[in-house]
A protein has these predicted regions:
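Short Gly/Thr/Asp-enriched flexible loops that form oxyanion-binding sites at enzyme active sites
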Residues: 68-81, 222-225, 398-404
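Short, polar loop motifs at secondary-structure junctions
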Residues: 8-9, 64, 308-309, 422-427
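Active-site-adjacent alpha/beta core region of enzyme catalytic domains
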Residues: 283-350
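Short, active-site-adjacent cap segments at secondary-structure transitions
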Residues: 11, 66-69, 217-219, 310-313
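Gly/serine-rich nucleotide phosphate-binding loop at the start of the catalytic core
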Residues: 181-296, 304, 312, 316-318, ...
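Active-site glycine-rich loop that binds ribose-phosphate moieties when present
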Residues: 360-374, 400
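Anionic-ligand binding patches
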Residues: 1-2, 9-182
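SIR2/sirtuin-family catalytic core signature
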Residues: 185-210, 216-218, 298, 319-322, ...
């Protein structure tokens, strides 16, 4: 379970509290913009849903509320902002002026299990000190708040053992009681390992072809599809976020080409940016990429990609390895190949007529009668598929799975396929499983690192199997 926060000290507290429980708390450093509201449940739901959208796995957030009698129970939900603006000394001065020192601190934990949102809390009642001794050891108010209970030495909060008595501890204890009866959508290490072993065995037998999407190119700094569309919009004097509100990506790409009366707009804007001969930064990122290294080490006989760029070909060339690129029918050679065959399923920047980027280009391809579609259908009868660099909601994945199911149904030769996604989706995983698609997700939140680890595990398992044989 990931604790999503900017605060490492809070994470360390929770990590220590969870030490003797079944929960392994990891830290994901991320700043969540807080909702301006006086409804604590609304604020917590906003924070935890923001975190869940980011990670797509069980997450936890917190929020601490200080209520000071002298301020009519403020700062309340806006405690962080309040302390940044006023500081401890000003708060103490005001309490002394009002002669009101009573205060209460509440910490709320909010967990998204992947299925439900669970909220817990813990609180301490006490008072604000009348003579501050600012140590800067604590969190905001820790140096000026004295708990009323179990505090014989009358210490401020920063001097107490938080792991034994804090509001966060009370909230954590409340939370694990509530979670005990809930289903939590964890990734399962045993299942991950089994899938790695099964997939490695198929790869060793040359029974797997790869399908590579935009996430692989994005790992070395090329834009994602959304970012690419945003850049097209900005080139047409739109704010990228406003441009995205006018339709899906293919429609927006169509608009950009129509507005500029230029069917080569994609090539004109990005050919030089995506050329490693003129882009030293991109070349450096590609050369040191572990993801491309492991893809090459898999040594699959066939690779399909919906990417327009040349990163796969360029990487093979850098490493002095041969690969046969097929973007148009003239590239295709029916003779037996000694090297991997790279099928540019949605075209190549080199051939403007081959690219599938706009809405009309996509619908033109929907008849599945091009040489590329026919070859794909033949390959689907021969190989299992491993999808890399796609999200489970990607339109390309849905199209490809439709083709796969149709071809397998027509021939009674259904093959298991695999998709690796750095961000899991429990609901779509179940739907895919029903259709013979096994979803594999790692336990690391960082997408690039997670993909590197998956491919590394796969390559290492392949080496083990080859040594045995």
């Amino acid at each position: 379970m990931y604790f999503v926060s900017n605060s490492e000290s809070k994470f360390k507290e929770l990590k220590q509290m969870a030490k003797n429980t079944k929960y392994d708390i990891q830290w994901y450093k991320y700043s969540i913009k807080e909702l301006q509201t006086d409804n604590v449940e609304q604020l917590l739901r906003h924070k935890v849903l923001d975190a869940f959208r980011k990670l797509k796995r069980p997450v936890m957030v917190d929020h601490t509320i200080l209520e000071v009698e002298a301020f009519n129970s403020l700062p309340g939900l806006q405690t962080n902002y309040f302390f940044r603006k006023m500081g401890n000394e000003e708060i103490v001065k005001f309490c002394n002026y009002k002669k009101e020192w009573k205060a209460k601190v509440v910490t709320k934990l909010c967990c998204c299990t992947g299925k439900k949102i669970i909220i817990s809390d813990g609180f301490e009642e006490g008072r604000i000190v009348d003579n501050p001794n600012i140590s800067n050891k604590g969190y905001d108010w820790d140096d000026i708040f004295k708990p009323a209970v179990d505090n014989d030495r009358d210490d401020v909060y920063s001097k107490l053992d938080k792991n034994s008595r804090s509001m966060r501890k009370k909230a954590w204890e409340d939370l694990i009681v509530k979670l005990s009866s809930e289903e939590i959508f964890f990734t399962h290490a045993e299942k991950y390992r089994e899938n790695i072993e099964d997939l490695a065995e198929l790869i060793c037998k040359k029974k797997v072809m790869l399908f590579i999407g935009a996430g692989i190119s994005a790992s070395i700094g090329l834009p994602s599809w959304n970012k690419l569309i945003g850049e097209l919009g900005e080139a047409d004097d739109f704010d990228a976020e406003i441009f995205s509100e006018y339709g899906d990506n293919m429609l927006l790409a169509e608009y950009s080409e129509t507005l500029n009366n230029n069917e080569n707009r994609l090539q004109d804007m990005f050919t030089d940016k995506w050329d490693i001969k003129s882009n030293d930064i991109l070349r450096s990122e590609l050369e040191k990429s572990l993801i491309y290294k492991y893809i090459m080490e898999l040594d699959c006989p066939v690779i399909y990609t919906t990417n327009f760029d040349h990163m796969i070909e360029d990487y093979y060339e850098m490493k002095k390895k041969e690969i046969n690129r097929v973007a148009v029918i003239d590239d295709f050679d029916n003779s037996e190949q000694k090297h991997p065959r790279l099928m540019k399923f949605h075209g190549d920047m080199k051939y403007k007529d081959s690219i599938v980027f706009t809405e009309s280009q996509y619908f033109k391809r929907m008849d599945y009668q091009s040489f590329m579609d026919i070859k794909l259908q033949a390959d689907l009868l021969k190989y299992n598929v491993l999808f890399l660099g796609y999200s489970l909601s990607d339109i390309n994945i849905k199209q490809l799975l439709y083709i796969s199911r149709k071809r397998w149904a027509d021939n009674g030769n259904k093959k298991i396929s695999y998709i690796y996604t750095a961000t899991p989706n429990y609901v779509q995983e179940k739907v895919f499983e029903k259709n013979g698609i096994i979803s594999i997700s790692g336990g690391v939140a960082d997408k690039k690192i997670a993909t590197e680890l998956f491919l590394k595990d796969l390559c290492e398992q392949i080496k083990i199997l080859k040594k045995r044989s």
